[in-house]
Amino acid sequence: MTIGIIGAMEEEVELLKNSMPSVEEIVIGGAKFYVGEIAGKEVVLLESGIGKVNAALGTTLMADRFKPEVIINTGSAGGMAEGLAVGDVIISDRLAYGDVDVTEFGYTYGQVPRMPAFYQGDAVLLKKAETIYREYFAASENKAVYGLVVTNDSFIMRPDQHETIRTFFPDVKAVEMEAAAIAQVAYQFDIPFLIIRAISDLANQEATISFDEFIHLAARQSATCIIELLKTI
């Protein structure tokens, strides 16, 4: 089994890359692929670049060239739900776009025409993650949360951005910039997927300072969770 893992930034894939005993690097169209093993599993690790287009391009290349049987997305996110703290982990059971509006044609806000309104994480992978992280976080000050993640091509920090997202997605748990695009490509290629992100900021007016300070913590938390998950796949 080949497992695809995708992170947008170097910081988000560094720990995973360093976990590979040997690595083959392949660059296609600016997307950086690292081929090796993690926890005894054959892995293709992608540093896609930031944003939906980069994520979709990289995921498509991964699906076409490397034929992964599972795709997992790692990285950071901005917390939107009450009670979330930096270092908490969000496991997404649903994903949506927060900046797509074709409602004039009868689509749900966030829905790309002829695509689902929400992309569902793989039920088997979600169950594995739930079991693992219940034990992993039992003695931790951080926690794992399950729910809706919303993807935007903007870094969310302003009150007006918050208001728009909460208006259309009142149960949103976190926001970020790639996951729904990855999920859409996985959906179109019929590849099971799971999104695991760690909170780097609280998507407020201090978010840029928090992100710069805590991106490495969030990346480490997310990557560590994925390594634990790989042991069970």
From Swiss-Prot:
Residues that bind substrate: G78, I156, M177, E178
Record-level Gene Ontology MF annotations: adenosylhomocysteine nucleosidase activity; methylthioadenosine nucleosidase activity
Active site per UniProt: E12 (proton acceptor), D201 (proton donor)
Catalysis performed (reactions): S-adenosyl-L-homocysteine + H2O = S-(5-deoxy-D-ribos-5-yl)-L-homocysteine + adenine; S-methyl-5'-thioadenosine + H2O = 5-(methylsulfanyl)-D-ribose + adenine; 5'-deoxyadenosine + H2O = 5-deoxy-D-ribose + adenine
SUPFAM superfamilies reported in the protein's UniProt record: Purine and uridine phosphorylases
Protein name: 5'-methylthioadenosine/S-adenosylhomocysteine nucleosidase
Gene: mtnN
Name of a matching Pfam family: PNP_UDP_1
